[in-house]
Structure formats: structure tokens, C-alpha cells
């Protein structure tokens, strides 16, 4: 089958839910037996989000091949079986970088390099490269229609219909239908203007996904269809769902996937959505109650910074048939005010990744509390590193132990810069990134969770466990349960004399899915449930 292309744009406001809509559509099409690939086009000039502040951009999602990408790719991987790569996310910066490189090589034979056709051709080339081998390629265009940054991308996808044929290209526009409480009415005018602006560019949307607080009445759907030149059945209501994993079911009920396959003339089997129904039922009515997990971090005022993490914890709850309630605690506040009653109602503690010294002493206090009070603990990336520092200080007696990231001249740098990072003077794309193999020690928390001795996980770091201190730490009871053998790099540490205490250098949250929860999150939530049951 010739690859079909679905382009998803957004209008009226940003953060309207294009990523979730795209991911949900991917899940629906996969349930019909189609091979789906996903892609995000980001209009910002940064080459990638790797050096952007979490407060501005939210989470950086890492793929197996080491791409630092937009957090929407996390949605795509969680909702579909698509294995995403560096080709799955590109920015204005990457496009212009490629075109300028070609111009310097002389690829354009002295011609004047312009937005049309050179920039738009490069965008189309990158879309086509990612779509190889797929039945359907879903491409989300970041930003909002009307943004000046988005214009080259919109022009490129406009050209796709002429290039690939009208029957092989579909445009979906996600828009807002606000409810004006003082008037008690839903207003369609913002949607009309957004579609008008899109049509001025040359794109006629085939389907509208209308984000609103309540179901759109039939007469309002008819009005939107009339003014926006779409079929009434192609006006899809999308209200806020009880759980984000209910969105595919809600969009299916509205007929989104039926409209897509009909308009693209694709014959498919009937959708099998039973796995999604099972997930939603477990979220709605868990048999084992709830557990409370504390996330001790420095970006807690913007929880989008921990998007994959919070979702992976939810997946752990699905696997254990319980609801996971998250409490975000500011590590700086713990650093200045102490533990106090922060963990009185908590069943487990998690310290996530991050960069920089700010708030790290608060994380160390939380880790010490988890270790000494026998509370299940999970440390990820920086969280694992701070667990090593805490153990070195409070168990091994190395009082000035620290990471050389924060104190380059400390006497006991139990966490140090990786050897291959020492001569690097550029920040962008230079960390240890992507999937690496890890060998597990039999009988440890990690090995029992995975049920295997060999695993592969995704990384994003520059600093590592300092092997110069391994003998001392191991002699005092800190178990090395996971090792990257090729570089003799410690990947996982544990405290054996503890209900469940594990720190890992990698980011397991990037590989967790609602239909396939990650083994470590499954085990962590199980340990939290066990503690909760014993405290009754």
C-alpha cells in the first residue's frame, strides 16, 4: 500500500492537545492493523530541545538512537508500537542547518537559496524519509496556525497534496471552541477564523477536532461544518477526558478513525480496542486502592518536566491494579526546612533526574530518610548519583563525598565526569545518549523485576559512578546490580538490607507504556503497595 500522510495542525491557542490527538489516532489506526509511524515538526530555531530549560520546554524525550526530542514523542511511543528515532522529530534549526550545509558544498550549483523551494523541499524530504515502510505517517506540526515560525512547514505540507495525490493526504486541524461562562454559550468564531487562516495558506482541513468543555450540539457541529467547509460528520468533539488513556476511546466513539480510513480509502479490519478498555477500567476502578508516591525534584513547579516519569508511575499502578497519587516536593524546600512531615502519608519516594547543584542537598536528605526509614526508594539518573553520595557520606564515612559536577575539587568525588566527556566543550548533543546494554546480577531487585540478566535502556548523562570508590562502597553494602560491561560503567545500585532501594543511571520511564508497563515501575509500585498494606 502506498503510504498515506496525515498532517495535524493546531489553531487558536497553543497546548491544545495536538500531541495527544495524534498519538490517540495512531493507537486507533494500529488497532485496525495498520503500520503507523509518527513525526513532530517543531518551528523553533534550536537544533533540538537538549539544551533548553525544562521550565520553557518541559521534558526532553530520548529515543533509542540518542535523539533529544520533544515530549510529544513520548506520547507517540506510549500510545503506539512505533519505534521512533532521530528522524521522528526535526526543527527549523535542523532544516536550515541542512540547507546551509548543502549550499556550502555547492549542491545548489550557484542558485539563489530560498524558502521556496529549498527549505520546503528539505522539510518534505525529511517527512518522506521517516515515512518509509509505514502504511500511515502521522505528522504533527508544532505551534499554532498564524505563527510566523510555522509558515515554511505549512507551505511544505500544502505541497504534499499535489506531490502525493489528493487521496493520499489528509489534513486534521485541532481547534478550540471556548465556553463563555457569562453568556452560557459555546463560541465557534475562533475556530472559524483559525480555519480561515489555514485556508488562506492553501490548506483545506478535512477533519476538525474541536476541543471544548462539553459535547458540541448537533446544530453547532452543522454551523462549524458550514463555515469551515467540512462535512458535519468530520467535526469531532474532544472534551477533557477522565484519563488521558481514555482519549483514543473517546475519539473512536466520535468516529475519528472511521472518518480517516474512509477519506483515505483504506480498507482495514474492525478495530480491537479491548486493551485500551482494560487500561481505562483499571484506572477508573482499581481493585487495590491507591498508593502515594513522593517525587522529590527541582522542577516541581512545572510537572511537564517529569511527563514520562509521571506516566510510567501510572503504568506501574495499572500493572498492580492500583491508583497512583503523586505528591511533588521541592528539593530546595527540603534542603532549607528539613524533612518535617513531608513523608508522613507517603508510601514510596522517587528522586528523578536533573542538572546542576541547586536542590541536591534536599534530595540527599530525602534519600537518607528513605534508606533509614525503610521506605521504598527509586533514584533515576541524578537521583541514583545522589543515592551514591548519600551512602558514601552516611554509611561509608566519607563526609565530604560529592559529585565533581558540583564540587570539582572535592576529596571524594564518588560521582565523576565520564572519561570521554573530558575534552568536550559544546553542550548540544554531546552527552551519553540513547540505548546501551546492561548486565544484571542474579537475585537482585533489578534482576527480579526484569526477569532477565541482559537489558537495554536509554541514557542522558555526562557523569558516572566513580569506580575508584567501588570497592569501598561495595564493602559497606552498596550492591552493584547492573553494569555496562564494555565500559565497566555502573548502571544500577541497590541497598540489599531494605524492602526496595534501587538507583539507575538510565531513564526507564522512556520505555514504559500503558499496555506494557516498565518492569522497574511495576516492581517499585508493588513495593509501595506492600509497605502500605503492612502499615495498616
Swiss-Prot record:
UTP binds at residues 14, 187-192, 223. Signal peptide: none annotated. It comes from the Bacteria. Residues 1-266 are annotated as: Amidoligase domain. Keywords: ATP-binding, Glutamine amidotransferase, Ligase, Magnesium, Metal-binding, Nucleotide-binding, Pyrimidine biosynthesis. Mg(2+) binds at residues 72, 140. GO terms for biological process: 'de novo' CTP biosynthetic process; CTP biosynthetic process; pyrimidine nucleobase biosynthetic process. Allosterically activated by GTP, when glutamine is the substrate; GTP has no effect on the reaction when ammonia is the substrate. The allosteric effector GTP functions by stabilizing the protein conformation that binds the tetrahedral intermediate(s) formed during glutamine hydrolysis. Inhibited by the product CTP, via allosteric rather than competitive inhibition. CTP binds at residues 14, 147-149, 187-192, 223. NCBIfam families: PRK05380.1, PyrG. This is CTP synthase. It comes from Geobacter sulfurreducens (strain ATCC 51573 / DSM 12127 / PCA).
Amino acid at each position: 500500500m502506498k503510504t498515506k500522510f496525515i498532517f495535524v495542525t493546531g489553531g487558536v491557542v497553543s497546548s491544545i492537545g495536538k500531541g495527544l490527538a495524534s498519538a490517540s489516532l495512531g493507537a486507533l489506526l494500529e488497532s485496525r492493523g495498520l503500520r503507523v509511524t509518527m513525526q513532530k515538526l517543531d518551528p523553533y530555531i534550536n537544533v533540538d530541545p537538549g539544551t533548553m530549560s525544562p521550565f520553557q520546554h518541559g521534558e526532553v524525550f530520548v529515543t533509542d538512537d540518542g535523539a533529544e526530542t520533544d515530549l510529544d514523542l513520548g506520547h507517540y511511543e506510549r500510545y503506539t508500537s512505533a519505534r521512533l528515532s532521530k528522524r521522528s522529530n526535526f526543527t527549523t534549526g535542523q532544516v536550515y542547518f541542512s540547507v546551509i550545509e548543502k549550499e556550502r558544498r555547492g549542491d545548489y550549483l550557484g542558485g539563489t537559496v530560498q524558502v521556496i523551494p529549498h527549505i520546503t523541499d528539505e522539510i518534505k524530504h525529511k517527512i518522506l524519509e521517516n515515512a518509509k515502510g509505514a502504511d500511515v505517517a502521522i505528522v504533527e506540526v508544532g505551534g499554532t496556525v498564524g505563527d510566523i515560525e510555522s509558515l515554511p512547514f505549512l507551505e511544505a505540507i500544502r505541497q504534499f497534496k499535489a506531490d502525493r495525490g489528493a487521496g493520499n493526504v489528509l489534513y486534521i486541524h485541532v481547534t478550540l471552541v471556548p465556553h463563555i461562562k457569562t453568556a452560557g454559550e459555546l463560541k465557534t468564531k475562533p475556530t472559524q477564523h483559525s480555519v480561515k487562516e489555514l485556508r488562506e495558506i492553501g490548506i483545506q482541513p478535512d477533519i476538525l477536532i474541536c476541543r471544548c468543555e462539553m459535547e458540541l450540539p448537533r446544530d453547532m457541529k452543522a454551523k462549524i461544518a458550514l463555515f469551515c467547509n467540512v462535512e458535519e460528520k468530520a467535526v469531532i468533539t474532544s472534551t477533557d477526558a477522565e484519563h488521558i488513556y481514555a482519549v483514543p476511546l473517546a475519539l473512536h466513539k466520535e468516529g475519528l478513525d472511521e472518518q480517516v480510513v474512509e477519506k483515505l480509502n483504506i480498507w482495514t479490519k474492525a478495530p480491537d480496542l479491548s486493551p485500551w478498555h482494560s487500561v481505562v477500567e483499571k484506572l477508573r476502578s482499581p481493585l487495590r486502592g491507591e498508593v502515594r508516591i513522593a517525587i522529590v525534584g527541582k522542577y516541581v513547579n512545572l510537572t511537564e518536566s517529569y511527563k514520562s516519569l509521571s506516566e510510567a508511575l501510572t503504568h506501574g499502578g495499572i500493572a498492580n491494579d492500583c491508583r497512583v497519587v503523586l505528591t511533588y516536593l521541592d528539593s530546595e524546600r527540603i534542603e532549607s526546612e528539613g524533612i518535617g512531615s513531608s513523608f508522613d502519608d507517603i508510601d514510596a519516594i522517587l528522586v528523578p533526574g536533573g542538572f546542576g547543584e541547586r536542590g541536591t542537598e534536599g534530595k540527599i536528605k530525602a534519600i537518607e530518610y528513605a534508606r533509614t526509614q525503610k521506605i521504598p526508594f527509586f533514584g533515576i539518573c541524578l537521583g541514583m548519583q545522589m543515592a551514591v553520595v548519600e551512602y558514601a557520606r552516611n554509611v561509608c564515612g566519607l563526609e565530604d563525598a560529592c559529585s565533581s559536577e558540583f564540587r570539582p575539587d572535592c576529596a571524594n568525588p564518588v560521582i565523576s565526569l565520564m572519561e570521554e566527556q573530558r575534552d568536550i566543550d559544546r553542550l548540544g548533543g554531546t552527552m551519553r545518549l540513547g540505548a546501551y546494554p546492561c548486565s544484571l546480577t542474579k537475585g537482585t531487585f533489578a534482576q527480579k523485576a526484569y526477569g532477565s540478566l541482559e537489558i537495554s535502556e536509554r541514557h542522558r548523562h555526562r557523569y558516572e559512578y566513580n569506580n575508584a570508590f567501588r570497592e569501598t562502597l561495595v564493602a559497606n553494602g552498596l550492591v552493584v546490580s547492573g553494569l555496562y560491561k564494555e565500559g565497566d560503567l555502573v548502571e544500577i545500585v541497590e541497598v540489599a538490607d531494605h524492602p526496595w532501594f534501587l538507583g539507575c543511571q538510565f531513564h526507564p520511564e522512556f520505555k514504559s507504556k500503558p499496555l506494557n508497563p516498565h518492569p522497574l515501575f511495576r516492581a517499585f509500585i508493588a513495593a509501595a503497595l506492600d509497605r502500605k498494606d503492612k502499615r495498616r
